[in-house]
């Protein structure tokens, strides 16, 4: 029975599309960012307990999908207010980001328009990399 489950799992892995693999990698990337940054919104600075925080992208995944896993581009935001209601609250995000990572790195993000098409192998590597980073952070 255990062998059958293992074979089933392998079979399911082979059926995953690039979209599935990127979604899984994004989940692990977001978990890592939330653990790395804690519960403090980069845009409004709130640390209120009981509200949901998410991994907000400075340059959105829709506008700059090549930056979707770039850690300079992703920071914790309060979900309901800054990330959703204010569509990322970029007017407050940018100054806080400059303070956090410096103007040069923010300008590099803003000027990075080189498209990148992720492959299935890259998506698997990205997922594994973020799982490992999260594990390392958890043990510190």
Predicted regions and their residues:
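Histidine-centered nuclease catalytic patch
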Residues: 42-76
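Short Cys/His-centered divalent metal-binding micro-motifs
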Residues: 46-49, 73-101
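Short Cys/His-rich Zn2+-coordinating modules
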Residues: 20-31, 58-64
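A boundary/linker detector
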Residues: 1-28, 113-140
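Short microdomains enriched in Cys/His and/or Lys/Arg
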Residues: 2-12, 61-74, 98-113
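Short, flexible, mixed-charge glycine/proline-rich loop motifs
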Residues: 27-37, 67-71
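Extended, acidic-biased charged interface segments
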Residues: 86, 90-91, 98-125, 129-132
């Amino acid at each position: 029975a255990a062998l059958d489950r293992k074979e089933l799992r392998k079979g399911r892995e082979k059926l995953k599309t690039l979209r599935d693999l990127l979604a899984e990698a994004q989940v692990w990337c977001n978990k890592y960012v939330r653990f790395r940054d804690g519960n403090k919104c980069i845009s409004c600075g709130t640390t209120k307990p009981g509200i949901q925080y998410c991994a907000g992208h400075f340059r959105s995944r829709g506008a700059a999908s090549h930056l979707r896993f770039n850690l300079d581009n992703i920071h914790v935001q309060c979900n309901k207010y800054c990330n959703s209601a204010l569509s990322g609250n970029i007017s407050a995000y940018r100054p806080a980001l400059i303070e956090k990572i410096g103007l040069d790195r923010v300008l590099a993000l803003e000027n990075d328009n080189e498209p990148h098409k992720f492959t299935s192998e890259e998506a698997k590597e990205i997922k594994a990399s973020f799982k490992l980073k999260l594990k390392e952070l958890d043990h510190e």
